[in-house]
Amino acid sequence: MTGGATGALPRTMKEGWIVYARSTTIQAQSECIDTGIAHVRDVVMPALQGMDGCIGVSLLVDRQSGRCIATSAWETAEAMHASREQVTPIRDRCAEMFGGTPAVEEWEIAAMHRDHRSAEGACVRATWVKVPADQVDQGIEYYKSSVLPQIEGLDGFCSASLLVDRTSGRAVSSATFDSFDAMERNRDQSNALKATSLREAGGEELDECEFELALAHLRVPELV
């Protein structure tokens, strides 16, 4: 999900509800990106939304590097795992349309917060980090109590999410903003926040990338 994206208003969270996500990263050919976006919108998204337990799909695109990330959200781990066989040919065809090969990861959606719906022109800053596997819970609580309120104060803030892989200690923090201009204006402030947060949480930055939010239709509840 990646990405902190929203295409619908939040639902009420069930007590103790844990939501999951599967992300597919494709290194696309630049001339195939628009065709790939249309394929996700017209073919992949309707197919996934018809599967039991799927509660949303988003697509992030970085035209400069060619990196594209499609993320599907699922009500339960069981629903996500049960969909694997159905999803595989859909994913492989999607990768062909983008002119690349898919790399798949599965996550727990540890946090999701929206200020308002995303609109055309919205962009996402995604930061991949790693913490010791035995400190994932502490990292999640630190994100919710300290990092998220500060992200929410950034210019143009729309929504934010945190995806975690408890086994590896890896996580993806994504923040959606109203426009690229807003994201550009808050970049220095975001970098300062990131440096402080990683130091205090004992985390390591693995990667960061800024994307256009090409598609978003998510019904993931507020998880804060």
From Swiss-Prot:
GO terms for biological process: cellular response to starvation. It comes from Mycobacterium tuberculosis (strain ATCC 25618 / H37Rv). InterPro entries: ABM_dom, Dimeric_a/b-barrel. Transmembrane segments: none annotated. To M.tuberculosis Rv2558. This is Uncharacterized protein Rv2557.
